Amino acid sequence: MAFRNPMYQLSNVDDIDSEVLNSRFLSETKDDGFSRRRTTLAVCATKKDLYLYGTTPAGGAEWCSEVLERTRPRIAHKRQRRRHVPRWISDSFRTCLPSPSGKWKEQTANEGEGRVKSSWLAACDERIGIAEPTNYWHGIVRTEDDSSKTLYLIPETWEDVHLKEGFVAIIDLAAERLQCSKLILFVDKNLSALSYLVKSLHWVGFEPVPHLDCVDHVLFGMEL
């Protein structure tokens, strides 16, 4: 299934001027006849690095503002092919997501076999992706019955998850840009370092979320 939904690029930047740090702007640019919007979403400062989120166009990733491009001209634009959601991630979301009240039937074609598979998603669900330099997060933003929003996230690998710096920026993105009041992570139960990861998640502020239908993953949540 082609991943054609919003993707957020997390860039590790070590020298951004105050103009970028204070920016909350939206600019319109045209490329090949199409309008694209780029905006600075969230900046997280740590002792050594700055983590900057920016929207990216479908099919590729790029620095999120002209200001940043002028600040770091030596950084080349990074083009990527459109991502595909691995089947195990799709299955995890379909199995572990709470049943919404309003649903719609999503049909996805298997390009290799030409078959169509149907699954149920909430009509208000929004699929997103978060790209880090060494990892990629697949996510769903769900609007609950009380109009609050929850961000569900699952990484392609837990080996390169930066619990301190990366999660602070992800929490900032979820709360400030996506307007979510809760963040829930999917953690593979078969991880060799599961016990250490659980302790680290507790340290960051996550708590286990019971879910009887989730067989291969355990859920951890945080109120934002």
UniProtKB/Swiss-Prot annotation:
Pfam families: ODC_AZ (PF02100)
Domain of life: Eukaryota
Gene Ontology BP terms: positive regulation of protein catabolic process; viral translational frameshifting
GO MF terms, alphabetically ordered: ornithine decarboxylase inhibitor activity
A GO CC annotation given for this chain: cytoplasm
Subunit structure: Interacts with ODC and thereby sterically blocks ODC homodimerization.
PANTHER family (alphabetical): ORNITHINE DECARBOXYLASE ANTIZYME
Role summary: Ornithine decarboxylase (ODC) antizyme protein that negatively regulates ODC activity and intracellular polyamine biosynthesis in response to increased intracellular polyamine levels. Binds to ODC monomers, inhibiting the assembly of the functional ODC homodimer, and targets the monomers for ubiquitin-independent proteolytic destruction by the 26S proteasome.
Protein name, as recorded: Ornithine decarboxylase antizyme
Species of origin: Schizosaccharomyces octosporus
Higher taxonomy: Eukaryota, Fungi, Dikarya, Ascomycota, Taphrinomycotina
